[in-house]
């Protein structure tokens, strides 16, 4: 995956509702099931399944929908929440597809070029996204898109 795909319309329609954790997990599990079965998929499902394919360590988590919905992922147990992780991949893909904050598409593409891999670049961006979300939540202030973009740009251009 060397380029970012334009999923703008799809993501805007998804942004019009806030899915429950169970709905998010169901979406990922069903997208992965469709991929494995070779069934037709919506573009957003294809994008999700592409990111799941990049994470073989999570394939079992996506294989059993009922278990996925029931399972808890406590922050302190050291196990990453694969659904949160994949949701962050989709969020970053969305940000790039609509270039919001303005300039993120170029910054992520530049970081991917430096890394030689879009997936590795996404993981670096995730660290910034997670930190900025935590900062906003703890301070009670809105998410600072400019600081987020600045962090990505600094990482993309550092020697």
What are these regions (language model features)?
Residues 131-134, 138-159:
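Glycine-rich, aromatic-bearing surface loops/beta-hairpins
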Residues 123-127:
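Well-ordered alpha/beta subsegment
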Residues 39, 62, 99-103, 133-144:
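Long, hydrophobic, amphipathic alpha-helical segments used as structural scaffolds
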Residues 45-111:
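Aromatic-anchored, charged helix-turn/loop surface patch used as a conserved interaction hotspot
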């Amino acid at each position: 995956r060397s380029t970012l795909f334009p999923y703008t319309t799809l993501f805007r329609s998804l942004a019009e509702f806030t899915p429950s954790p169970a709905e998010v997990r169901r979406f990922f599990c069903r997208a992965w099931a469709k991929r494995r079965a070779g069934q037709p998929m919506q573009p957003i499902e294809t994008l999700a399944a592409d990111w799941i394919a990049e994470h073989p360590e999570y394939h079992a988590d996506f294989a059993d929908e009922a278990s996925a919905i029931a399972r808890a992922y406590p922050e302190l147990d050291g196990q990453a929440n694969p659904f949160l992780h994949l949701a962050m991949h989709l969020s970053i893909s969305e940000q790039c597809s609509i270039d919001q904050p303005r300039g993120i598409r170029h910054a992520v593409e530049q970081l991917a070029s430096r890394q030689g891999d879009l997936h590795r670049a996404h993981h670096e961006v995730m660290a910034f996204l997670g930190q900025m979300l935590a900062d906003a939540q703890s301070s009670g202030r809105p998410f600072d898109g400019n600081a987020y973009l600045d962090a990505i740009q600094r990482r993309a251009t550092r020697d």
